């Protein structure tokens, strides 16, 4: 009887509920209303500029006319490939005004996935930012959006009328068939999804909305329109600030309204966000801990909804007043029905659990070019709507199980299928399974599940049925053998070529058989439960860490870092060793953001890329900036010249005469480093130019007066920019810091010649940097004596920070110079011991001394990097030593290395814009009777020892012993391994051209390796005096690549067998 009464009430409810009405208006029309109402109000506040509503309207219309001229019309699909920028908003509106349909492309996706997305929608053209134009070019016809392009807009080009029911955008999500599926959303659906929801979401003209969501997430569209359709302001941080400095970015942009997934919100400290008034959480389940953390500080709102429903489906408008975190609130733009999960023609009674079905004006149209999938998810005319005027409207089956509470709000239960969310990203497990089966081959059974296993957030686990299991085996989970681990390493690499990183399983479990339910289906629940029963030690076995000897953190810095790792990863301290891998312990990008944020509270300054690049506590602690390094005694000016044979008055007068300044203008003076000597004095012998010319195209919003002030502040705070080289006595040089300004010149015909390519700023006593500005072009000429590869981006960081109103710290170079010139007994003995017994043979030998060593040829190569127990630098060094040993006929190899020396015990040295680099000799003694792993491990120890004793110049090493003299400054090969610093420049200086006219190879052979996270580019330059038929350098480089890749796959092969394994003949035998 009770059930019949409940069913009766449900039927009555069905008659009473009304579906919200369609709002038949286009997105750009709603936006234009805001333009008329608040023409001069801020619409976009971004790292690269600001736009009012009027300016955004003008720019988007200009771009729309260009698109129309190029054939974009009603229904044309136009993907957008941008880094976070104000130009994103311009491009979105322009496509809509031209009648087109846009979609976002996440630039970090694998190229194959982006290509599929463009093919799937038959993309007419790709719009990109300038920084992504190269990627867009690979995807088809493209346009790079910038001010120069808008200047070509045809004023007479008519724009088409657009109907509200036309498609506006496509949101791509994971698809169970192995391919992403595109959700087609109309103008009127998006308008309804925004305007029906604005009040319960507290959106209005005062809202300053954060742009944070990945372009892979449908919320990225909504963030823009949440702001622009209600008259608010879109606040866009740079990608660097988004990843590494989110809390400060929110405050700097004065964000008061933000959508974040709970996983991201947990990274932030609510007490440090006074500007934030409304926090909207969604994308994944909200916990009571999230509510307790945030509701005392902000108005906490929860939203729920699949991408198929524009805006959001339900809103919990005040989480501070609900009893359960699972209460997802009420619908405003749609009507929610709850049906039997196995039969959508049957409504369930109030309070019963069923599948949520959505109906209303914010519903999407279906899936692009996928009628079969659309028919499964979208339905019309269910029995319980028969005879009603809404019966013919489309409804969407969400696949989510919910129940309706007595007040009409909804309580979320779970998914009914294999769709999951990881860090807010929607994933169809079937798509991951499809690709995993494909790369494994052999029709292997694979089940992928999202499992928490004691962590704050879920991760993907792949369960793989293993062939050829002995009949006696009864265990469901099998211990991973070496063969299984090798297959998984290959599988991961191949999956990353097909899927975004968040869709690649983190853990792979070998299973005896696929368990099934009584109905014959795969028993996913049992696999999840069995996995959660594994101990951490057992889980680590699947990362290949179970046999590793753990060395606990040693130093104070390492112990602090260990505590931070434990907090982020939810591990006990004893589980984290100094050389454990961040990823292998469960770290991901969100965890890295949290680690970077926590590290700041300990005065450690990390970035997300650094955490993944250095990946172990020991490596991180060698590369972080910290204020716990040893105290440096304050230095008085001229302290490093106290022992000079000349009296102080003579020194000052010599400096004043050569620099043509008064003695009062001399701030300090101290010895020059070997790098400075090599870059300034030595090249005079060959008439060489070591001046670097940089030209930057600045964002159009940059204010010249403000930039001039920022440059003056940078010069004042960086004495190295005011440094000049002085010849104190014959062949004895020092550097002097002069109290003088370096003007930012306005460039015109009268002074342009001073900034032409190939101009050399070098000169004894002369300034070594020159800067000019012409329109939005910033030009710098700077001599290598006052910068190195890592310090130069820091100069531009300081300019950018000063431009944004930040104070700059005064950075002195003298403490580092003192450290590099100190030669204590342990350091002296280290270098003497290092080269004891070396016979002094140089490789490659100079074959024709009459040839100029500066003239050179270049060969290039490529390495694919596998992340394992060894750093890329470690593997490159050992690889080079091996190949040199084959060509040189000895296992005792010496070559030069470029050392950044940023781990010096100087406060803030890692973040200081001073040239710390040195070229030092190095020696690797290979053991052919041991494995490659043994030789790599021995070199790891060698690297650590070098870092402890690198505070020395090569000319000082040369004086220590006859063996040292034989190698210091006389080695034939120089190796430079360095990260690709293209992204190290701040956003306003990203678009640049660099021209360098110095010698490319003053040594016999220079090998430069530029590292990115997954690969390395090799440049091998050889002086003309080295090139000869005896040495086949193309073959040398081929061997180098082959050895490097072999080492990664087979580290347990003995070195003496390596050449035979690779089928490489003896290079010293006749060809």
Swiss-Prot record:
It is an enzyme of class 6 (ligase). InterPro entries: AA_adenyl_dom, ACP-like_sf, AMP-bd_C_sf, AMP-binding_CS, AMP-dep_synth/lig_dom, ANL_N_sf, CAT-like_dom_sf, Condensatn. Residues 33-417 are annotated as: Adenylation. Its EC number is 6.2.1.-. GO terms for cellular component: cytoplasm. The keyword Ribosomal protein does not apply. GO terms for molecular function: ligase activity; phosphopantetheine binding. Keywords: Ligase, Phosphopantetheine, Phosphoprotein. It catalyses: (2S)-5,5-dimethylpiperidine-2-carboxylate + 10-hydroxy-pre-flavunoidine + ATP = flavunoidine + AMP + diphosphate + H(+). Residues 689-961 are annotated as: Condensation. The modification O-(pantetheine 4'-phosphoryl)serine is found at residue 589. GO terms for biological process: amino acid activation for nonribosomal peptide biosynthetic process; secondary metabolite biosynthetic process; terpenoid biosynthetic process. Residues 552-628 form the Carrier domain. It comes from the Eukaryota. Pathway: Secondary metabolite biosynthesis; terpenoid biosynthesis. Nonribosomal peptide synthetase; part of the gene cluster that mediates the biosynthesis of flavunoidine, an alkaloidal terpenoid with a tetracyclic cage-like core connected to dimethylcadaverine via a C-N bond and acylated with 5,5-dimethyl-L-pipecolate. The tetracyclic core is synthesized by the terpene cyclase flvE and the cytochrome P450 monooxygenase flvD. Belongs to the NRP synthetase family. NRP synthetases are composed of discrete domains (adenylation (A), thiolation (T) or peptidyl carrier protein (PCP) and condensation (C) domains) which when grouped together are referred to as a single module. Each module is responsible for the recognition (via the A domain) and incorporation of a single amino acid into the growing peptide product. FlvI has a monomodular A-T-C architecture. This is Nonribosomal peptide synthetase flvI. It comes from Aspergillus flavus (strain ATCC 200026 / FGSC A1120 / IAM 13836 / NRRL 3357 / JCM 12722 / SRRC 167). The lineage of its organism: Eukaryota, Fungi, Dikarya, Ascomycota, Pezizomycotina.
């Amino acid at each position: 009887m009770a059930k019949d009464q409940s069913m009766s009430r449900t039927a009555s409810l069905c008659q009473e509920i009304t579906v919200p009405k369609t709002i038949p208006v286009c997105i750009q029309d709603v936006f234009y209303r805001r333009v008329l109402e608040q023409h001069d109000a801020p619409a976009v506040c971004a790292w690269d500029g600001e736009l009012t509503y009027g300016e955004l309207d003008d720019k988007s219309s200009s771009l729309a006319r260009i698109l129309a001229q190029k054939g974009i019309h009603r229904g044309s699909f136009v993907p957008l490939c941008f880094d976070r920028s104000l130009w994103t908003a311009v491009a979105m509106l322009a496509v809509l005004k031209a009648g087109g349909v846009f979609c976002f492309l996440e630039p970090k996706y694998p190229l194959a996935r982006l290509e599929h997305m463009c093919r799937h929608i038959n993309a007419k053209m790709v719009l990109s930012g300038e920084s992504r134009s190269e990627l867009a070019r690979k995807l088809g016809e493209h346009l790079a959006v910038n001010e120069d392009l808008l200047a070509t807009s045809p004023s007479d080009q008519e724009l088409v009328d657009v109907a509200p029911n036309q498609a506006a955008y496509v949101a791509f999500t994971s698809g169970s068939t192995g391919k992403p599926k595109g959700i087609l959303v109309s103008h009127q659906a998006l308008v309804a999804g925004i305007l029906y929801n604005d009040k319960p979401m507290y959106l209005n003209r005062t809202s300053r909305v954060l742009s944070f969501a990945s372009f892979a997430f449908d919320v990225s569209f909504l963030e823009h329109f949440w702001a622009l359709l209600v008259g608010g302001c879109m606040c866009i941080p740079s990608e660097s600030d988004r990843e590494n400095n989110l809390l400060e970015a929110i405050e700097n942009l004065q964000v008061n309204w933000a959508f974040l997934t709970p996983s991201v919100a947990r990274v932030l400290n609510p007490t440090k966000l006074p500007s934030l008034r409304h926090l909207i959480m969604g994308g994944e389940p909200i916990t009571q801990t999230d509510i307790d953390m945030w509701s005392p500080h902000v108005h906490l709102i929860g939203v729920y909804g699949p991408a198929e429903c524009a805006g959001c489906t339900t809103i919990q408008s005040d989480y501070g007043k609900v009893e359960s975190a699972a209460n997802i609130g009420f619908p405003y733009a749609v009507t929610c029905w709850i049906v039997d999960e196995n039969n959508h023609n049957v409504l369930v009674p109030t309070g019963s659990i069923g599948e949520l079905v959505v109906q209303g004006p914010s519903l999407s149209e279906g899936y692009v070019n996928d009628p079969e999938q659309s028919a499964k998810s979208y339905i019309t005319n269910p029995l319980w709507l028969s005879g009603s005027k809404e019966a013919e409207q489309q409804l969407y089956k969400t696949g989510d199980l919910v129940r309706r509470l007595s007040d009409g709000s909804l309580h979320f239960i779970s998914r009914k299928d294999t769709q999951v969310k990881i860090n807010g990203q929607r994933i169809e497990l079937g798509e991951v399974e499809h690709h995993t089966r494909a790369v494994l081959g052999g029709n292997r059974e694979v089940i992928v599940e999202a499992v928490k296993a004691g962590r704050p957030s879920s991760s993907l686990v792949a369960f793989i049925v293993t062939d050829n299991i002995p009949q006696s085996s009864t265990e469901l989970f099998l211990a991973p053998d070496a063969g299984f681990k090798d297959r998984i390493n290959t599988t991961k690499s191949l999956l990353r070529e097909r899927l975004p990183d968040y869709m690649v399983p983190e853990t792979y479990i070998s299973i005896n058989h696929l368990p099934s339910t009584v109905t014959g289906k795969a028993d996913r629940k049992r696999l999840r439960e069995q996995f959660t029963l594994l101990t951490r030690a057992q889980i680590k076995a699947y990362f290949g860490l179970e046999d590793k000897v753990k060395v606990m953190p040693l130093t104070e810095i390492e112990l602090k870092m260990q505590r931070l790792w434990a907090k982020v990863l939810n591990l006990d301290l004893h589980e984290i060793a100094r050389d454990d891998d961040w990823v292998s312990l469960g770290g991901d990008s969100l965890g890295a953001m949290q680690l970077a944020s926590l590290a700041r509270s300990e005065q450690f300054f990390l970035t997300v890329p650094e955490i993944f690049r250095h990946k172990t506590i020991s490596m991180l602690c060698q590369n972080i900036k910290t204020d716990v390094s040893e105290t440096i005694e304050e230095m008085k000016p001229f302290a490093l010249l106290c022992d000079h044979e000349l009296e102080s008055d003579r020194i000052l007068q010599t400096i004043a005469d050569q620099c043509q300044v008064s003695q009062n203008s001399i701030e300090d003076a101290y010895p020059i480093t070997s790098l400075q000597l090599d870059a300034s004095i030595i090249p005079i012998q060959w008439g060489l130019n070591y001046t670097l010319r940089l030209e930057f195209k600045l964002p159009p919003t940059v204010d010249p007066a403000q930039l001039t002030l920022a440059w003056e502040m940078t010069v004042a705070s960086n004495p190295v920019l005011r440094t000049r080289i002085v010849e104190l006595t014959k062949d004895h040089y020092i550097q002097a810091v002069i109290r003088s300004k370096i003007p930012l010149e306005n460039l015109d015909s009268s002074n342009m010649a001073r900034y032409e390519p190939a101009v050399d700023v070098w000169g004894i006593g002369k300034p070594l940097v020159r800067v000019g500005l012409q329109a939005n072009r910033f030009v710098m000429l700077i001599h290598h004596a006052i910068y190195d590869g890592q310090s130069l981006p820091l100069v531009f960081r300081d300019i950018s920070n000063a431009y944004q109103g930040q104070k700059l710290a005064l950075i002195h170079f003298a403490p580092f110079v003192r450290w590099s010139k100190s030669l204590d007994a342990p350091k002296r003995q280290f270098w003497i011991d290092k080269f004891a017994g070396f016979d002094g043979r140089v490789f490659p030998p100079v074959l024709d001394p009459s040839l100029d060593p500066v003239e050179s040829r270049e060969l290039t190569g490529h390495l694919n990097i596998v992340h394992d127990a060894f750093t890329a630098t470690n593997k490159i060094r050992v690889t080079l030593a091996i190949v040199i040993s084959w060509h040189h006929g000895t296992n005792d190899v010496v070559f030069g290395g470029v050392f950044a020396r940023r781990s010096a015990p100087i406060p803030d040295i890692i973040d200081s814009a001073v040239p710390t680099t040195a070229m030092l000799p190095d020696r690797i003694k290979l053991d052919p009777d041991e494995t490659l792993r043994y030789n790599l491990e021995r070199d790891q120890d060698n690297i650590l020892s070098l870092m402890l004793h690198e505070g020395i110049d090569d000319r000082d090493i040369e004086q220590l012993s006859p063996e040292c003299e034989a190698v210091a400054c006389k080695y034939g090969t120089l190796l430079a391994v360095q990260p690709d610093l293209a992204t190290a420049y701040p956003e306003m200086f990203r678009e640049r051209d660099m021209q360098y006219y110095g010698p490319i190879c003053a040594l016999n052979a220079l090998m430069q390796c530029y590292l990115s996270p997954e690969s390395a580019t090799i440049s091998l330059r050889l002086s003309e005096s080295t090139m000869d038929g005896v040495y086949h350098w193309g073959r040398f480089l081929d061997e180098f690549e082959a050895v490097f890749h072999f080492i990664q796959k087979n580290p347990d092969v003995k070195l003496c067998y390596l050449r035979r394994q690779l089928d490489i003949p003896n290079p010293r035998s006749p060809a």
